[in-house]
Amino acid sequence: MQGILIVDKPTDWTSFDVIAKLRGILGTRKLGHSGTLDPMATGVLPVFCGGASKAVDLQLDHTKAYRAVLRLGARTDTGDSTGTVLETAPVTAGEKELLDVLPHFIGPQMQTPPMYSAVKINGQPLYKMARQGIEVERKARPIEILHIEYEGSPAENEYTLTVRCSKGTYIRVLLEDIAAAMGQKGTMSALRRTSAGLYTEADAHTLEEILAAKEQGNAALEALMLPVESVFESLPLLVVEPWVEQHLYNGCPTSRYPAADGRYRVRNAEGQFLGLSLIHISE
């Protein structure tokens, strides 16, 4: 069984919990996921099954989109509402101040990963150090906020934001920084990933739906999966003749092929996806 299963991750599950559950449902250990989600977060988690797992590191679109809730009045050690409160302060700002500062967070910037993260220093994840009460210096990393928008206030001192950003962005840190720019203490009280690359909430299935499909048979389960070719939809398509197909399977370079320089997704004459090909015309 091969394909990409877009899972709607439930809250209080780690991304690895989802993989472990799917290994039981699908009966295979050959699974990989793209973009770890914190346990409190929900939403889009692409899982690559079988041979499709080779495509995890080949994705072309690494942008992510989120819907997050900023809660003013307190700051926690984890940057979200699951953590221990470190500071509290009266809330003296609101919607106006939020709207004033949001434009300043759009664009390329440097962001320091939080201690409660999977980033490794000297081979050890930061979150393990944080649990021992150890804090170490972390290097800021380049990120980009492509879009950020205020969506409303679900409760007093809470503000819902939608964010589209580059890979590696920590929304918890972003919300803390937004609160600080407002002159407030703040933390993230909810987070949902609404898209990961090409994949959106509309593509996602709950674990219950996946299990129900499995009980109906492999055909129903495979119907939930997206083809591995979907990862490369933005690449131009190249349809090759049988002799070229055989060359590609054998790992042989093929000369004199009528296509411009570049990277292509390749199908055979029957429409079967074969893989990727790089064409370079020597001068």
Predicted regions span which residues?
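Glycine/acidic-rich beta-strand-loop module
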Residues: 30-60, 128
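Residue-level signal for inorganic ion chemistry
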Residues: 47, 68, 123, 174, ...
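Acidic, low-complexity central loop/insert segments
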Residues: 58-110
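Extended alpha-helical targeting/anchoring segments
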Residues: 117, 121-147
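Pseudouridine synthase
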Residues: 118, 125, 157-201
